[in-house]
Amino acid sequence: MKPGIHPEYGPVVFRDRSTGTQFLTRSTATSEERVEWSDGNSYPLIVVDVTSASHPFWTGGRQVLDTQGRVEKFRRRYGDRARGGQ
């Protein structure tokens, strides 16, 4: 790889918002928020809505996610225009 043009790639903890499950992996994503991991080190924390711990495809079940906030945000942003301008 050419030096100086690629983002830094390091350890990051991803936390599933709905289940609280945490995954330590590597990513170019960063965060100011940090979390203490079981190895005693502190890593950047990124909170995500869906992971393999909560997605129905991976869990084999059906889990209702909180989409009310998304729907309300959409309605505030687009209002009646979303219904075809009626």
Swiss-Prot record:
Pfam families linked to this entry: Ribosomal_L31 (PF01197)
PROSITE patterns: RIBOSOMAL_L31
InterPro entries the UniProt entry points to: Ribosomal_bL28/bL31-like_sf (IPR034704), Ribosomal_bL31 (IPR002150), Ribosomal_bL31_B (IPR027493), Ribosomal_bL31_sf (IPR042105)
SUPFAM superfamilies for this protein: L28p-like (SSF143800)
Keyword Ribonucleoprotein on entry: yes
Highest taxon of the lineage: Bacteria
A GO molecular-function annotation: structural constituent of ribosome
GO cellular component: ribonucleoprotein complex; ribosome
Subunit structure: Part of the 50S ribosomal subunit.
UniProt xrefs under PANTHER family: 50S RIBOSOMAL PROTEIN L31, CHLOROPLASTIC, LARGE RIBOSOMAL SUBUNIT PROTEIN BL31C
UniProt record similarity statement: Belongs to the bacterial ribosomal protein bL31 family. Type B subfamily.
Protein name: Large ribosomal subunit protein bL31B
Organism: Saccharopolyspora erythraea (strain ATCC 11635 / DSM 40517 / JCM 4748 / NBRC 13426 / NCIMB 8594 / NRRL 2338)
